């Protein structure tokens, strides 16, 4: 799993797969190359951001999902951008969705900056109130000024040999996510709307309206973190917290886990833990995008995470990326039958 099944006991947050954030990606949009001057960054590039959620299937022994393919109508889906390194949102893209009615659903999107980006609800400039959610694979993008958006059911780009991991890392060569689908939100955003500097931090969250309040149900920046390192009894709490508190909350416990799991020295374990704390995906747009610098759809983050946990002792799983990826927006493949 990447961030799939991130609640305690390998369940969905709130026992609802629509609240399960599965993956987050950040990479340069093809044709929108990044150009950088020596003294001042000349921002002519475009960054692609993708938030996936709502996995349509689950490998054993995880119980199969029972809810539908739509976005949750009472949830707030958010992509947060930190532009100054303080683990606080300076920019936020927020999405809500209508009720699912006879196979039809529509989204509303907002773009917030400054203090508004740190408010949990949908605030800021409304980009669109008529974002069509596609369930049949047809791409229905909306152009909101300089930002391109799309939402719908897509093929899950994550690939992993779960059976092999459950059997002592004797890899089987089987991709348990080959036929999985997810709900995907894709954006192309001009770089000059993502801060002045080349480095950004990205994380996503899904919150649920409950008793008049927004309750954060899932969150993540780096792939394969919460389901991999936090023990049961800690996962739900982790999902409810904010990245700004991660170092204080998790540096000690995670360093100890890494010492025990990978044979790291205490100093090495601390350094390894700080590679993913706070849990924010860092992306330097002056450098090629491959995890841990941003994340592209072909990154083998499953193997990367096990190597991190084991201090290089667990070999790569040997799987290849999915062959249905697109070279153009929205980049993920059409949904599997």
Show which residues each predicted segment covers:
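Surface-exposed extracytoplasmic segments
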Residues: 1-337
């Amino acid at each position: 799993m990447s961030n799939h099944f991130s609640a305690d006991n390998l369940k969905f947050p709130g026992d609802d797969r629509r609240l399960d954030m599965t993956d987050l990606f950040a990479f340069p949009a093809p044709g929108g190359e990044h150009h950088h001057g020596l003294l001042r960054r000349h921002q002519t590039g475009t960054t692609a951001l993708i938030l996936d959620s709502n996995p349509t299937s689950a490998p054993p022994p995880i119980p199969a999902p029972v809810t539908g393919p739509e976005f949750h109508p009472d949830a707030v889906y958010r992509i947060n951008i930190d532009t100054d390194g303080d683990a606080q949102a300076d920019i936020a893209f927020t999405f809500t969705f209508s009720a699912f009615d006879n196979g039809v659903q529509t989204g509303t999107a907002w773009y917030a900056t400054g203090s508004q980006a740190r408010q949990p609800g949908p605030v800021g400039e409304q980009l669109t109130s008529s974002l069509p959610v596609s369930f049949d694979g047809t791409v229905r993008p909306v152009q909101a000024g300089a930002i391109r958006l799309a939402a719908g059911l897509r093929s899950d780009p994550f690939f992993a040999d779960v059976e092999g991991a459950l059997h002592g890392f004797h890899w089987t060569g089987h991709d348990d996510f080959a036929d999985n689908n997810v709900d995907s939100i894709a954006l192309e955003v001009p770089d000059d709307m993502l801060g002045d500097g080349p480095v950004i931090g990205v994380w996503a969250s899904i919150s649920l309206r409950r008793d008049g309040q927004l309750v954060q149900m899932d969150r993540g920046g780096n792939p394969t973190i919460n389901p991999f390192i936090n023990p049961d009894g800690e996962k739900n709490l982790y999902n409810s917290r904010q990245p700004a508190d991660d170092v204080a909350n998790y540096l000690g416990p995670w360093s100890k886990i890494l010492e025990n799991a990978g044979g790291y020295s205490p100093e090495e374990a601390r350094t390894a833990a700080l590679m993913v704390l706070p849990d924010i995906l860092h992306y330097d747009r002056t450098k090629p995008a491959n995890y841990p610098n941003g994340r592209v759809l072909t990154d083998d983050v499953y193997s990367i995470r096990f190597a991190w946990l084991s201090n290089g002792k667990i070999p790569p799983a040997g799987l290849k990326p999915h062959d249905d990826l697109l070279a153009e927006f929205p980049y993920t493949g059409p949904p599997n039958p």
